[in-house]
Amino acid sequence: MKRTDADIPGPGVGTVSVEMFNLKLDNPADALRGEVVGADARLVRRRIRLDGVGFGELLGITDLDMANPYDISPAGGVASEARLTGTVPGAREPATVVVTLRLVNGTFHMRPSQLINVAAGEEQTVLDGFTFDLDTRELPLGGPADLVQLRGGSFELSRDRVNTVVEPADLEPLAGASTLGKHD
């Protein structure tokens, strides 16, 4: 696995990574030398993680806090919903909402499903501020994301290639766009 913090086109700063599982190598020592290009892999996963700072930058919310809506412990578990707290543009004070996280035809959709703590008269501003869409094909995932989730206070978008061959671009997390045409 290779992981790096990087400036991601669109979202801003986040962590990008590539993981490979169940490699079939002619010589197992190749793994120690990092010579895996051309090997069969059960799974190659590209992942982008955005914390409250990175995702808040996208939303224009400088004080964004993200948590699992059902388990607010630091580990938080995995969820397809998130509890977000922050001051959306145009609001006077922070609000707390639960949002759904969905992928439809390669586009990430975030929609408020529950208003938990919102100042009177700011409901529509908060609903608008926590509504967001992002075309994941523009991210360094090598194609559209096939999973979105909240894990431990960060959003994760990922794309899996199953039963594939490791390519040179798989060794660099930010090279994902170069594999777009080959795997769609």
List the predicted regions and their residue ranges.
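N-terminal beta-strand/beta-hairpin edge segment
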Residues: M1-N68, G77-G86
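Solvent-exposed coil/turn segments that connect beta secondary-structure elements
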Residues: T4, F21-L23, T87-P89, R102-G106, ...
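Short beta-strands and strand-coil junctions in structured, solvent-facing domains, enriched
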Residues: A6-I8, A91-E93, L157, V165
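Amphipathic hydrophobic-ligand
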Residues: G10-S17, R92-T96, P140-G142
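A short, surface-exposed beta-strand/turn
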Residues: V16-D26, V99-V104, P173-D184
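Short helix-loop boundary/capping segments
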Residues: I72, G76-E123
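Extracytoplasmic/luminal low-complexity segments enriched in Pro/Gly and acidic/polar residues
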Residues: V118-D184
